[in-house]
């Protein structure tokens, strides 16, 4: 079959509908011939198609027709299109509503002139210009009640026949003026209505509430249409039946009946369910377990799965002998004869006549063999490391077994997790997966380049203990190494005694590999081996360094060997941990508990004294937030005290008992840290929901264990007891209260994050790398350089950012580059400075730490400049800046830091060219990769129990998913967080004073009311210290009262005076005459006064001004003040003096003021900041997403495809059921390029290996001659060599 390059959409013409000879003219029939279940309409389960005699896998169905006699029916989805066309013509005479189209040559008009002509036809003229007609124009609507077109003025029915006659009489030369793209007759059914094939309405397997239905709902609706047509019903009746079948929402608002529109829209649409994500055969699912005997590239499949699933073997010259043997051994289950087009089930002792021919193209099915490639994964599949393809191995029992090394990448534990598997049947896909999805190929992460496989659990402890072994005899070493012992004897140097370091050197087996502080000439020079060296996703992972030096094959080999050796070491030497290891000395926990009780009592005593002094009026109280922060920090001090005591205790235990198992675990970086020990031995600490202490409930308390309005910290969720002590009833309740909120979070967040992940992947999936190393989206250039280095992301490496220093050689050149680059490294409003920089690859593994013959600094500098100049011109075409690559080489290869020989320099630059030439292939699906990495991270973050929060100004926000969601949805007309930064605090104080919400009650006023003859006198005494603390003035308080009283509808007349009583008290006196009824209004007024007399924007957050040191350079900071306020727009700041104030608005304000490029930069930094600390490597995916959102003239939400040519099939799979309807109406032709379209037309998308064509002519292999090389003459060899050099 030839490859489909483009697809056109159009409507079926009536002639095409009439062409079928399958007449449907019965409602019921014994053998269902002539009914809507007629087997001529296509094959169904186990029944061949009576039209083409094929099975349901090969028959795509056939259309039928039912006669509608003289009726004319409008196709339901195009009723609005018919009404639109009628709006441009006269319904009486059929002429257009303007004379001009008849007087000009339409085909010669430009697009601008054609647009003007269209406007004239749409003009609001009242009556027809045709002198023979002169009738008023009629407005036509569709009546849901009458189910027909009606005249808007008198609600009289407009016959479909009249509409059909007028619309089809429009001459085709006028179609461009009316935006008609094909014969308008295709908008109607005339003579016959089409009956769709059985394929879209299967009679079996249609389930509702677990009750099997014999008849699909669509089939039932079609039966109703046939029934009305047979009865020759009137037009509206047939029209209504067809609308109910097509889209019932056209006439009914609250119906959820299945119809064509319903099954092609929304989350469960047919395209998404049966084409994009259909269920597959040859799959299995089972519980997951570990098997340490498996290599990383293997998976254990139980016997019952291997005996159930089958794989195909195609007959050709290479396989025919094997297949014959398998027939004789009775291992063949099915045989497919291509000539006869027949699938035969092979049963034991059953004679088969004239069906087994074993010709090329035939295939057989047999049980899965060992070493067949099988795809398996664990759900949810958040990124591509969850789904891999490994070699099948036999395994005991009934569970799927995986090597423990891949558990991290699949986020799997062995507590009942399940894994799914699938055996692909197409040899092409088996070959493809065995390369592209093989664990060796997937070892390094696509973005940060760290290995995704590594040791887990007890292997970490084994590595730590093994490294510390010494005085090992050769026999002991051989025993530990097991099956690798023979290799050790032949390859490793002989010694009398060996250490753990020797075993690691043998496992690494790369004598040339180096890395500062870790490896020197293949030997580990670090003090200890902890989790950082052997666990997956670590920068210092030894397997990662080996991969950077050699390839993934050697990296996987190390993981396999190390895992085997660690397990064997544990088996021989053992490792155990008991309760004694956890708490070797109960005196310590007793003493710590006594100290905790003493300290919590001191805290409570101080707090009570403070509350007592406030009640007596000796001091003024702190504001509620300041009081909570103060208590919080004191309790945090108690927690920190526990951690410090435990750390001190751990050091004492290590000095007394260095073999304590728990301490070993802690040193190895496995499971135990001082905070976790604090929960067990010290105190369980403050319980929080979303970073906040627990809110009080009824009577100002959480539990009835405490007095109403109690301020006791233990009543607010501080758990003093440790787990070893056990929790009291109330403490246990607090622990479970947090567990409840976390459980709810996880349940709710899973679906939200999954939905957003799907949208982001759908949005980014068609962004690929082109053959120039640029990122393109369709035909639009998005980025000049993929990954900024034009090198695959898994190869790039974050290295330490070395700041300019006078001790560095080439200091002036480095400083000049730094001045160009520094603004990119100082971010987050100057609060942070980058510690790492992207290197094009991990060149440090090639640098020898004991170099004796270094290059001269000038020669090295010239070589670096030569390479950079060549790369800039020939790889980046002088379009993209690569100053950062030059900076990395000048600082990291600096003679003042390292000695680099000429051979090492040449090797490093050869490797650089190798990476530039070969790693980033054209078609790399960088959009999908970036989308998956972002989605995986925010899903993990949202599901994590521990959300980080930060106070950004007064707005306390949960970092992570919520904000990421808002940024990508880009909702307009919502408040935006605006940050103001200045070195002058007074300018910010003015803004704070105006915008911060303060109400009278916050000033703790004493309010009294007295009745006079004609009015009420209300005295409000306020302590001026409260006014000062809230950074207000007496005038502002006066203004608050004045504003409230003047706008109050309860007040008839009023007056006001202000008096200073003494040094501290100021009195505001209100003289008020209330409206009738006086008593009721007086009571309402007094109830409202403390809260309703306020100023600023109503908000539960204060607007604090924070002070921080802002970086201006790596060694310079300035003191700045920052304020964050939530506003609708910047207009609200228009009246303030903002000279020399740095205003950082939200995304829409940024776009409206500075344009799309600034919005892109803002979005990139904002998206990255939602992930928190330590995830800077996500900058590239965030930048790519921001670039896509800002690809056009305004930012576009990821929910929409407003800009750019998005194919109808992509829109359809995204849930837009109108996409294909509109494409057919406008007769669109679209290229089959994007992922969604390629799904439907069996076309390999041009991503990844899409540029390679699979074609093997086996005949050539059979005829190949060994002597072919001898026929090449010497001259030809020289020519070939020259050509390769030129290339």
UniProtKB/Swiss-Prot annotation:
One of its GO terms (molecular function) is DNA-directed RNA polymerase activity. SMART domains: RPOLA_N. Its main location: virion. One of its GO terms (biological process) is DNA-templated transcription. Keywords: DNA-directed RNA polymerase, Nucleotidyltransferase, Transcription, Transferase, Virion. It is found in: Virion. It is an enzyme of class 2 (transferase). One of its GO terms (cellular component) is DNA-directed RNA polymerase complex. Its EC number is 2.7.7.6. It comes from the Viruses. Pfam families: RNA_pol_Rpb1_2 (PF00623), RNA_pol_Rpb1_3 (PF04983), RNA_pol_Rpb1_4 (PF05000), RNA_pol_Rpb1_5 (PF04998). It catalyses: RNA(n) + a ribonucleoside 5'-triphosphate = RNA(n+1) + diphosphate. Belongs to the poxviridae DNA-directed RNA polymerase 147 kDa subunit family. The DNA-dependent RNA polymerase used for intermediate and late genes expression consists of eight subunits Rpo30/OPG66, Rpo7/OPG90, Rpo22/OPG103, Rpo147/OPG105, Rpo18/OPG119, Rpo19/OPG131, Rpo132/OPG151 and Rpo35/OPG156. The same holoenzyme, with the addition of the transcription-specificity factor OPG109, is used for early gene expression. Part of the DNA-dependent RNA polymerase which catalyzes the transcription of viral DNA into RNA using the four ribonucleoside triphosphates as substrates. Responsible for the transcription of early, intermediate and late genes. DNA-dependent RNA polymerase associates with the early transcription factor (ETF), itself composed of OPG118 and OPG133, thereby allowing the early genes transcription. Late transcription, and probably also intermediate transcription, require newly synthesized RNA polymerase. This is DNA-directed RNA polymerase 147 kDa polypeptide. It comes from Fowlpox virus (strain NVSL) (FPV).
């Amino acid at each position: 079959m030839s490859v489909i390059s483009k697809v056109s959409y159009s409507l079926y013409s009536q002639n095409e509908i009439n062409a079928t000879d399958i007449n449907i003219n019965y409602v019921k029939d014994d053998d269902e011939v002539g009914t809507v279940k007629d087997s001529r309409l296509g094959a169904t389960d186990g029944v061949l198609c009576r039209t083409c005699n094929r099975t349901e896998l090969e028959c795509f169905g056939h259309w039928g027709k039912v006669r509608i006699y003289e009726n004319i029916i409008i196709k339901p989805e195009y009723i609005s299109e018919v009404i639109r066309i009628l709006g441009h013509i006269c319904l009486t005479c059929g002429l257009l509503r303007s004379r001009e189209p008849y007087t000009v040559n339409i085909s010669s008009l430009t697009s601008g002139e054609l647009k003007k002509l269209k406007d004239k036809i749409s003009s609001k003229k009242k009556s027809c210009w045709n002198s023979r007609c002169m009738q008023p124009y009629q407005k036509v609507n569709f009546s849901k009640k009458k189910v027909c077109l009606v005249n808007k003025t008198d609600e009289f029915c407009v016959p479909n026949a009249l509409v059909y006659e007028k619309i089809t009489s429009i001459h085709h030369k006028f179609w461009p003026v009316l935006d008609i793209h094909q014969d308008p007759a295709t908008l109607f059914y005339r003579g016959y209505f089409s009956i769709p094939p059985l394929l879209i309405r299967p009679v079996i397997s249609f389930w509702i509430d677990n009750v099997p239905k014999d008849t699909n709902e669509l089939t039932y609706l079609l039966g109703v249409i046939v029934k009305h047509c047979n009865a020759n019903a009137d037009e509206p009746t047939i029209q209504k039946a067809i609308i109910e079948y097509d889209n019932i929402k056209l006439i009914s608002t609250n119906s959820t009946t299945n119809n064509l529109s319903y099954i092609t829209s929304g989350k469960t649409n047919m395209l998404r369910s049966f084409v994009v994500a259909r269920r597959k055969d040859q799959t299995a699912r089972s519980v997951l377990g570990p098997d340490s005997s498996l290599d990383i590239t293997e998976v254990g499949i139980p016997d019952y799965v291997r005996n159930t699933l089958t794989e195909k073997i195609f007959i050709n010259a290479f396989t025919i002998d094997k297949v014959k043997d398998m027939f004789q051994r009775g291992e063949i289950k099915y045989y497919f004869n291509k000539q006869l087009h027949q699938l035969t089930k092979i049963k034991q002792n059953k004679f088969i006549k004239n069906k087994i021919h074993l010709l090329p193209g035939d295939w057989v099915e047999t049980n899965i063999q060992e070493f067949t490639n099988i795809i398996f994964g664990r759900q949810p599949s958040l990124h591509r490391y969850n789904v891999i393809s490994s070699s099948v191995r036999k395994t005991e029992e009934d569970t799927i077994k995986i090597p423990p090394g891949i558990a991290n990448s699949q986020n799997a534990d062995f507590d009942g997790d399940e894994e799914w598997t699938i055996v692909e049947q197409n040899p092409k896909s088996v070959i493809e997966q065995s390369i592209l999805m093989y664990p060796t190929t997937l070892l390094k992460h696509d973005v940060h380049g760290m290995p995704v496989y590594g040791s887990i659990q007890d292997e970490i402890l084994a590595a730590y203990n093994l490294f510390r072994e010494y005085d090992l005899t050769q026999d002991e070493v051989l025993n530990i190494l097991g099956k690798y012992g023979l290799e050790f004897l032949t390859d490793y140097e002989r010694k009398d005694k060996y250490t753990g370091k020797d075993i690691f050197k043998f496992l690494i087996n790369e004598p040339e590999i180096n890395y500062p502080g870790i490896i020197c000439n293949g030997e580990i020079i670090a003090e200890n081996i902890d989790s950082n060296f052997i666990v997956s996703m670590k920068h210092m992972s030894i397997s990662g360094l080996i991969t950077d030096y050699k390839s993934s094959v050697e990296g996987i080999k190390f993981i396999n060997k190390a895992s085997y050796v660690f397990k064997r070491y544990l088996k021989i030497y053992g490792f155990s941990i008991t309760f004694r290891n956890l708490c070797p000395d109960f005196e310590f926990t007793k003493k710590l508990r006594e100290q905790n009780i003493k300290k919590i009592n001191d805290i409570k005593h101080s707090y009570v004294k403070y509350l007592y002094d406030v009640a007596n009026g000796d001091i003024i109280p702190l504001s509620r937030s300041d009081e909570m922060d103060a208590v919080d920090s004191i309790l945090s001090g108690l927690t920190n005290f526990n951690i410090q005591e435990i750390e001190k205790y751990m050091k004492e235990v290590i000095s007394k008992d260095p073999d304590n198992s728990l301490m070993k675990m802690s040193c190895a970086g496995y499971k135990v840290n001082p905070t976790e020990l604090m929960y067990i031995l010290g105190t369980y600490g403050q319980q929080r929901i979303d970073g906040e202490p627990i809110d009080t409930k009824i009577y100002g308390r959480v539990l009835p264990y405490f007095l109403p309005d109690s301020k006791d910290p233990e009543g607010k969720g501080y758990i003093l007891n440790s787990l070893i002590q056990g929790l009291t009833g109330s403490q246990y309740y607090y622990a479970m209260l947090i567990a409840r909120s976390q459980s709810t979070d996880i349940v709710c967040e899973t679906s939200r994050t999954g939905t957003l992940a799907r949208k982001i992947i759908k949005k980014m999936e068609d962004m690929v790398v082109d053959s120039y190393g640029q990122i393109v989206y369709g035909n639009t250039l998005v980025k000049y350089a993929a990954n900024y280095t034009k090198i695959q992301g898994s190869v790039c490496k974050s290295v330490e950012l070395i700041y300019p220093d006078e001790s560095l050689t080439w200091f002036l050149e480095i400083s000049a580059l730094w001045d160009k680059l520094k603004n990119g490294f100082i971010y987050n409003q100057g609060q942070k400075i980058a510690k790492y920089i992207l290197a094009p690859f991990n060149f440090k593994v090639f640098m020898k730490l004991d170099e004796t013959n270094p290059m001269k600094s000038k020669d090295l500098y010239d070589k670096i400049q030569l390479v950079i100049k060549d790369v800039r011109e020939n790889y980046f075409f002088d379009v993209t800046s690569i100053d950062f690559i030059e900076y990395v080489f000048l600082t990291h290869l600096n003679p003042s830091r390292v000695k680099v020989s000429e051979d090492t320099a040449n090797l490093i630059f050869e490797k650089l060219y190798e990476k530039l030439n070969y790693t980033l292939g054209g078609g790399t699906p960088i959009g999908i990769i970036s989308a998956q990495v972002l989605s995986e991270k925010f899903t993990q973050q949202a599901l994590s129990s521990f959300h980080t929060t930060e106070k950004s100004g007064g707005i306390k926000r949960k970092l992570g998913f919520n904000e990421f969601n808002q940024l990508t949805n880009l909702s307009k007309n919502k408040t935006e967080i605006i940050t103001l930064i200045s070195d002058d605090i007074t300018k910010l104080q003015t803004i704070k004073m105006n915008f911060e919400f303060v109400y009278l009650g916050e000033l703790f006023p004493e309010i009294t009311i007295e009745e006079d003859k004609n009015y009420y006198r209300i005295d409000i005494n306020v302590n001026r210290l409260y006014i000062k603390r809230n950074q207000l003035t007496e005038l502002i308080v006066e203004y608050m009262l004045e504003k409230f009283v003047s706008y109050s509808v309860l007040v008839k007349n009023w007056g006001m005076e202000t008096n200073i009583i003494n040094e501290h008290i100021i009195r505001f006196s209100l003289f008020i005459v209330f409206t009738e009824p006086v008593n009721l209004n007086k009571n309402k007024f007094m109830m409202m006064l403390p809260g309703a007399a306020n100023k600023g924007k109503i908000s539960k957050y204060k607007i604090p001004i924070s002070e921080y040191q802002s970086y201006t350079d790596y060694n310079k900071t300035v003191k700045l003040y920052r304020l964050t306020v939530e506003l609708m727009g910047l207009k609200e700041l228009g009246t303030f003096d903002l000279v020399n104030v740095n205003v950082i608005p939200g995304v829409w304000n940024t776009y409206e003021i500075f344009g799309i490029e600034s919005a892109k930069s803002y979005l990139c930094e904002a998206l990255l900041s939602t992930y928190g600390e330590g995830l800077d490597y996500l900058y590239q995916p965030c930048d790519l997403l921001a670039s896509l959102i800002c690809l056009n003239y305004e930012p576009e939400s990821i929910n929409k495809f407003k800009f750019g040519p998005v194919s109808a099939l992509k829109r359809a799979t995204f849930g837009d059921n109108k996409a294909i309807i509109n494409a057919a109406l406008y007769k669109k032709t679209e290229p089959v390029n994007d992922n969604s379209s390629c799904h439907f037309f069996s076309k390999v998308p041009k991503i990844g290996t899409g540029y390679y064509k699979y074609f093997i002519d086996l005949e050539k292999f059979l005829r190949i001659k060994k002597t072919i090389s001898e026929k090449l003459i010497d001259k030809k060899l020289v020519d070939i060599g020259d050509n390769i050099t030129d290339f």
